[in-house]
Amino acid sequence: MAEIENRPSNFIRTRIDQDLASGKHASTHTRFPPEPNGFLHIGHAKSICLNFGIAKDYNGLCNLRFDDTNPEKEDINYVNSIKEDVQWLGFNWDGEIKYSSNYFDILYDYAVELINKGLAYVCFLTADQAREYRGTLKEPGKNSPYRDTASDENLALFEKMRNGEFKEGECVLRAKIDMASSFMVLRDPIIYRVRFAHHHQTADKWCIYPMYDFTHCISDALEGITHSLCTLEFQDNRRLYDWVLDNISLECHPQQIEFSRLNLEYTIMSKRKLSDLVVNNHVEGWDDPRMPTIAGLRRRGYTPASIREFCLRIGVTKQENMVEMGMLEACIREDLNENAPRAMAVLDPVKIVIENYDADKVETLSVANHPNKEEMGRRDVPFTREIYIEREDFKEEANNKFKRLVLDKEVRLRGAYVIKAQRVEKDENGEITTIYCTYDPETLGKNPSDGRKVKGVIHWVSASEAITAEVRLYDRLFSVPNPAAADEFESTLNPDSLVILTNAKLEPSLANSAAEQGFQFERTGYFSRDSKAKNIVFNQTVGLRDSWSKTQ
């Protein structure tokens, strides 16, 4: 066993420790089994970190297996995106990628075994009839009229299903368990159905496909999984998981353990609802930076380390709860504060003219890329007579609490000089167009020699050397903490979740930034270079501090 000092503690790991100590298992073998019918989201990241994290901490194995039993909704593009997301998060699966479809021949043989044992039968009830026969939570179901068909006849019918001699919906193969069971999942569940659909792995070899509950447990057993971890909605399904494995000739019997899924404030995790957002053009796609998908978080500027840290902090329990969005944002904020280089960007620019600075002069200033990490180096920032500052950083009149630029008062420019506002120029609407200032040439990197105090510091960029870029400011996608609870979840969308600024002025070094590279725009927030835009676009990742909670 690996060293345990830094391992997270939870009930699953306690169970694993007990199994290893008792000799039930010599090592651990977990798996992450997504269905390739959509893009992974932050909820899947919790399962990824749990399963791959256990393999890492216990020197065990973790498989990546695609649960590809529903070809009509699956696509090879989803397969590829899931592989990319898992690796981007920092994990690698053991051995070859697995597919449930790899086991279709074996699954068919086990279905035949159940038929031979009198534990499965071909049923011709319509969907409406089957629903009626199933009963309710308060009333037991009743047996299908096809339940007692002889095994030989069922074998022949099942072979006809495989040969495509029945239409879709005409018949299914059902497990024969107990129509009076208090657990609905045990009331003769469907284990095979007819589907004339092209499969991304097996092409047109099959026209019958096994159901998830039949496939999942057998796939686990075939791969030697020791601990099959899934979310709480599959708790009742564990009884079917165990029933299948107890009634076929497979020695390996993995243990299914359930944990609570991730519920995150101000977003949704339902694939169907996320798809609705895309289809109805509420977002720009599955990788829209407002989406909780891994692709969306990545494009917004979240790092793999921040997502792993978030999954570590929320822990693993059986208790369903709503996690504050602020916890996720705190993880990326801490990561970027520690690791992101600094840069200056003016999002709402107003021009300053420094009247006593040479009009033709371009001075190159050396500015640290990180205030606490000398190893991150320095960069050159051009300083000129005309610069831009944030419009909100200037007032004609202000009290002493306003530590920025005010008429007849001084402020320091980050990494440069102290300037003093002398007068302003306005347009016909009274909007300030230019602020005229003077500078103290003796204050580069030092305080005024006469001892006067200059308390405020603001950021700036050179007007002539700056690059113009688009900056996208993001807010919560929804305006309520639990949009999934609303009758019409789309009615809770936040109309101000995206603000696009087209005239931001950035220091020229940012022109050479790489896609997905994160920065702290000084005094503004954390931003990431967009990975899809042809022009220079920066997406806001998160603010410098959690201002949202203070306004609630």
From Swiss-Prot:
Cellular component, GO annotation: cytosol
Cell compartment(s), UniProt: Cytoplasm
Record's keyword terms, sorted: Aminoacyl-tRNA synthetase, ATP-binding, Cytoplasm, Ligase, Nucleotide-binding, Protein biosynthesis
Binding annotation for ATP: 35-37, 41-47, 231, 261-262, 269-271
Subunit description: Monomer.
Binding site for L-glutamine: 67, 212
Gene3D superfamilies reported in the protein's UniProt record: Glutamyl-trna Synthetase, Domain 2, Glutamyl-tRNA Synthetase, Domain 3, HUPs, Ribosomal Protein L25, Chain P
EC number: 6.1.1.18
Catalyses which reaction(s): tRNA(Gln) + L-glutamine + ATP = L-glutaminyl-tRNA(Gln) + AMP + diphosphate
Pfam families assigned: tRNA-synt_1c, tRNA-synt_1c_C, tRNA-synt_1c_C2
GO molecular function, one term: glutamine-tRNA ligase activity
Protein name per the record: Glutamine--tRNA ligase
HAMAP family noted in UniProt: Gln_tRNA_synth
PROSITE patterns for the chain: AA_TRNA_LIGASE_I (PS00178)
Motif 'HIGH' region: where in chain: 34-44
Highest taxon in the source lineage: Bacteria
GO annotation terms (biological process): glutaminyl-tRNA aminoacylation; glutamyl-tRNA aminoacylation
UniProt family annotation: Belongs to the class-I aminoacyl-tRNA synthetase family.
Lineage start: Bacteria, Pseudomonadati, Pseudomonadota, Gammaproteobacteria, Alteromonadales
EC category: ligase
InterPro entries per record: aa-tRNA-synth_I_CS (IPR001412), Gln-tRNA-synth (IPR004514), Gln/Glu-tRNA_Ligase (IPR050132), Gln_tRNA_ligase_bac (IPR022861), Glu/Gln-tRNA-synth (IPR000924), Glu/Gln-tRNA-synth_Ib_cat-dom (IPR020058), Glu/Gln-tRNA-synth_Ib_codon-bd (IPR020059), Glu_tRNA_lig_a-bdl (IPR020061)
Motif 'KMSKS' region, residue range(s) on this chain: 268-272
Signal peptide: none
